């Protein structure tokens, strides 16, 4: 397709530029990506349900006046923020509500991860309390009014035909292509987590990332 053709063109131009200055034999070329995309067919607004359950409160004009929990849609996952995470009663109430929504199959997500669970699983961290994972064809918005489910609308970039932000088990898997003086030829390795990428590149450059979450992919390094 056009995108692959353009990528190949610009990659070739970079390689040719390095060859022109006589540094090809001293240069490592690394081609990779952080994620792919999956097709989505609908857009979910779980804040509408939080509002119905009383976790989001508004005035007569639908302006938020107070909240216990708010969901920020970020593509094919959503981050749940609590106003006061130290309020254990509210924490449990929100957690129970999210799991009930998950189990219903109506709101577009099939997993509810706590912050601790998603940090251990995917190295994702932040000031959120929970992460909601897509069912594989739903992306998420942050609205708290109107319908919970919207059909795909490509006129709004937030609700386009495809999105990312999901667990890496879904969708096309990005590849890593590496060649140059630091890499072995003809070596193929199985899937590795993306946190291994930076330590691998660093080691190829002779740098030790001692505090990195991942580790070098030594199988491809000389």
Question: Model segments located where?
Answer:
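Active-site-proximal segments of metal-dependent phosphoesterases and phosphodiesterases across multiple
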Residues: 1-11
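Secreted, luminal/periplasmic, and some membrane-associated catalytic domains
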Residues: 13-158
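Residue-level signal for beta-strand positions within conserved beta-sheet cores that form or flank
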Residues: 25, 172, 213
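A glycine-biased structural micro-motif
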Residues: 186, 211-215
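Terminal low-complexity/disordered tails
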Residues: 201, 206-210, 221-222
